[in-house]
Design a protein with these regions (language model features):
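Structured binding elements
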Residues: 1-98
Length: 98
C-alpha cells in the first residue's frame, strides 16, 4: 500500500464496510425460504478483502509509527492523521462487523 494511495485505499475500505453491512442486512431480511447463498458468497468475499485491508493498514501503521523516515514526503501531522484514520476504520471493521 503506497502512501500516495492512502486516501483511495481508505475510501475503498469504507465502501467495503458499507457493502458488507448491506449484504448482512439483505441476509437478515430475507424472507423465509428465500435463498441467500449468493449474498453469503458475496459477503465472504467482501469480508476476505476487508481482512486484507486490515493487514495492509496494520503494516502501514507500523511503518508510520516505527519508521516514519521511509515517508519523507508525508508530514508528521499527516502521519498522525493517517494513524488515527487507520484506528477508526479498524474500529469499524472489528467492532461493528465481528
Amino acid at each position: 500500500m503506497s502512501t500516495d494511495n492512502f486516501e483511495r485505499n481508505y475510501r475503498d475500505a469504507q465502501d467495503r464496510v458499507e457493502r458488507l453491512r448491506t449484504q448482512i442486512d439483505q441476509i437478515n431480511n430475507a424472507r423465509p425460504g428465500q435463498s441467500v447463498a449468493s449474498q453469503k458468497y458475496l459477503m465472504k468475499a467482501t469480508w476476505a478483502t476487508l481482512q486484507t485491508d486490515i493487514s495492509n493498514f496494520d503494516q502501514l501503521n507500523y511503518y508510520y509509527t516505527n519508521e516514519p523516515h521511509k515517508y519523507p514526503s508525508v508530514s508528521k501531522k499527516e502521519i498522525q492523521r493517517r494513524i488515527n484514520l487507520i484506528a477508526e476504520i479498524k474500529g469499524l471493521i472489528e467492532g461493528q462487523l465481528t
